[in-house]
Curated annotation (Swiss-Prot):
InterPro entries: GNK2, GNK2_sf, Kinase-like_dom_sf, Prot_kinase_dom, Protein_kinase_ATP_BS, Ser-Thr/Tyr_kinase_cat_dom, Ser/Thr_kinase_AS. It comes from Arabidopsis thaliana. It is found in: Membrane. Glycans are attached at N32, N42, N60, N69, N103, N262. This is Putative cysteine-rich receptor-like protein kinase 20. It is an enzyme of class 2 (transferase). Belongs to the protein kinase superfamily. Ser/Thr protein kinase family. CRK subfamily.
């Protein structure tokens, strides 16, 4: 009986061993031989290649780390090579796979100097070029599962797969092994699994670039797919494929014979298989549960219904937004934002304002957005923040930058805007090498577009919005150089008082601020009108308001300088020299006149934006005589003349004293 019991144990052991061994057999997938360069069988290169392959498949190779590179010979017959095993396989599986790939390499590519071989558990590569620590994405291959996605539209399926795969790519690029897996839900009944891996000798950025290219090459019209590139691989499928081949060879063990009668044999013969099946069942669900906890999760591009594809075509112009817009329909997933901005990589930083930093973000489908990461001293709670975002998102006009949505994650508050490609107006306006791209005709259209955008905020939108920080840096230019006003509504979103006429916290940029706002915190639509006037003068002159400094005993800024030219009857001296003779004097003089009306000290004297738009579009409208501007700065000569009434002066207007270090209104 004991021999029978031993036989049963040996049978079970051999069955399990053979099952495991069969699962471990390296599975060939694909190879690529470069036919551009070859070698002869008896050449030095052939000898060096065999030396290299022997080194990579030796007993002392780095199977425990799953990666090794090597070099053999000297130029011009030098060979460089490497192997890479899947990040979660055991050293035994890695060694077995590399041994097989080395043995088969010379038969698959008998005379080619450069080749790459892909197996389920490993990859082998060699070349006559230096391929070590070098990104290579040429000569890849894409494979697909034969079945179509189940009850999911293709664009939605693509979104569901791309986002977690790109997040896994970021995780892999930041890890030492350059390897990561993920699991995500396709629907309530089905999950998908993903895996990405680079060669560990790549830099973090090269690894991420390679994986993103690999992931984006997939068509995502099947339930599973994989891409092989020389420097990286990616795969997704509807089963947990990355756990099929990660078990090492079992340790040898000999069952001990037991004693007993027929009942013992029957019990053992029945209990052992049942026990084995039960243990396998428990192990399966334990692993499944553990994997569920540690995966980077089911992360659709958005937490709710909105799809990434919906932000690719923002409306050119609408009246007052969409009444069905809700906070939920605008909410982005934080991990999607992190992935789109490459973890807020400094190279993606577009700028920084008073409310936070702005980054360029690119979603896997290629959609680009501007991501504003708000400062953490916002006065809003989450609910209030969401409500204000909904209000601002409804403000849609062709001369306003569209707010696409927001994101909340812990202390993080993020706004997502449409991406405007041509940077801001100040980038072109104040750079002598770029000014030529903005001739007068184009600048005149920009002035009109800005005016229409502000008019919409003041009058045509459902709620009156006062910008409070209108400046050249907040005017973005689209691909056709059309202006789009940015950062409107930030006072509402940031939790600042927008309904009262006074505020203790003044936000904005000095030089653009109206006197009553800068000094006393009093703001109104006329505060924006003042800023618009300063902006028009900058557009006409190509100079910053603050660029004029104390020279030859005079103290000046652009507003003061313009007023003096106007008073002296020589406003044409303000015109940007880059225009040459390509402008209409009457048109440009009218713009200067309108700007001076906007920067008058008394807010009641300034025109409304509605009147300004009419002045710009209808040349027959007579313009009022402008009064002295706010923040008018006196020269030393003017101060002396005012101190000595006996001097012969032309008292055009009354001017209060001010200094360049302590600017004050009249």
């Amino acid at each position: 009986m004991s021999s029978l019991i031993c036989f049963i144990f040996l049978f079970l052991f051999s069955f399990i061993t053979s099952f495991t061994a069969s699962a471990q057999n390296p599975f060939y997938l694909y190879h690529n031989c470069s036919i551009t360069t070859t070698y002869s069988s008896n050449s030095t290169y052939s000898t060096n290649l065999k030396t290299l392959l022997s080194s990579l498949s030796s007993r002392n190779a780095s199977y425990s780390t799953g990666f090794q590179n090597a070099t053999a010979g000297q130029a011009p017959d030098m060979v460089t090579g490497l192997f890479l095993c899947r990040g979660n396989v055991s050293p035994e599986v890695c060694r077995s796979c590399i041994a097989l790939s080395v043995n088969e390499s010379l038969s698959r590519c008998p005379n080619e100097r450069e080749a790459v071989f892909y197996y389920e558990q490993c990859m082998l590569r060699y070349s006559n070029r230096n391929i070590l620590s070098t990104l290579n994405t040429d000569g890849g291959v894409f494979m697909q599962n034969a079945r179509n996605p189940i009850s999911v539209k293709q664009d939605r399926f693509r979104d569901l797969v791309l986002n977690p795969m790109n997040l896994a790519a970021i995780e892999a690029a930041r890890s030492i092994k350059r390897f990561a897996v993920t699991k995500f839900d396709l629907n309530a009944l089905q999950s998908l699994y993903g895996m990405v891996q680079c060669t560990p000798d790549l830099t973090e950025q090269d690894c991420l670039d390679c994986l993103q290219q690999s992931i984006n090459q997939v068509t995502y019209d099947k339930i599973g797919g994989r891409t092989f590139l020389p420097s990286c691989t990616s795969r997704y499928d509807n089963y947990e494929f990355y756990n099929e081949f990660n078990v090492g060879t079992p340790q040898d063990s000999s069952p001990r014979p037991g004693k007993g009668g027929n009942s013992s044999v029957i019990v053992i013969a029945v209990v052992v298989p049942i026990t084995v099946l039960f243990l396998l069942f428990v192990a399966f669900f334990s692993v499944r549960r553990a994997k569920r906890k540690k995966t980077i999760g089911a992360i659709p591009l958005f937490k709710v219904k909105r799809k990434e594809t919906e932000v690719t075509e923002p409306p050119a112009e609408t009246t007052d937004g969409d009444d069905i817009t809700t906070a939920g329909s605008l909410q982005f997933d934080f991990k999607a934002i992190v992935a789109a901005t490459d973890i807020f990589l400094p190279i993606n930083k577009l700028g920084q304002g008073g409310f936070g930093e702005v980054y360029k973000g690119t979603f896997p489908s290629g959609v680009q957005v501007a991501v504003k990461r708000l400062s953490k001293n916002s006065g809003q709670g989450e609910k209030e923040f969401e409500n204000e975002v909904v209000v601002v998102a409804k403000l849609q006009h062709r001369n306003l930058v569209k707010l696409l949505g927001y994101c909340l994650e812990g202390e993080e508050k993020i706004l997502v805007y449409e991406f405007v490609p041509n940077k801001s107006l100040d980038y072109f306006l104040f750079d002598p090498t770029m000014q030529g791209q903005l001739d007068w005709s184009r600048r005149y259209k920009i002035i009109g577009g800005i005016a229409r955008g502000i008019l919409y905020l003041h009058q045509d939108s459902r709620l009156t919005i006062i910008h409070r920080d209108l400046k050249a840096g907040n005017i973005l230019l689209d691909a056709d150089m059309n202006p789009k006003v940015a950062d409107f509504g930030m006072a509402r979103i940031f939790g600042m008082d927008q309904t009262e006429a006074n505020t203790r916290r003044v936000v904005g940029t000095y030089g653009y601020m109206a006197p009553e706002y800068a000094m006393y915190g009093k703001f109104s639509m006329k505060s924006d009108v003042y800023s618009f006037g300063v902006l028009v003068l900058e557009i006409v002159s190509g100079m910053k308001n603050s660029s004029l400094d104390q020279m030859d005993g005079s103290i000046s800024n652009l507003v003061t300088y313009t007023w003096r030219l106007w008073s002296n009857g020589s406003p044409s001296e303000l015109v940007d020299p880059s225009f040459g003779d390509n402008y209409q004097t009457s048109e440009i003089t009218r713009c200067i006149h309108i700007a001076l009306l906007c920067v008058q000290e008394d807010a009641n004297d300034r025109p409304t934006m509605s009147a300004i738009v009419q002045m710009l579009t209808t040349s027959s409208i007579a313009l009022a005589v402008p009064r002295p501007p706010g923040f008018f700065l006196r020269s030393k000569q003017e101060q002396a003349e005012r101190a000595c009434p006996s001097m012969d002066t032309s008292d055009l207007f009354s001017i209060d004293e001010a200094s360049i270090t302590s600017v004050a209104p009249r």
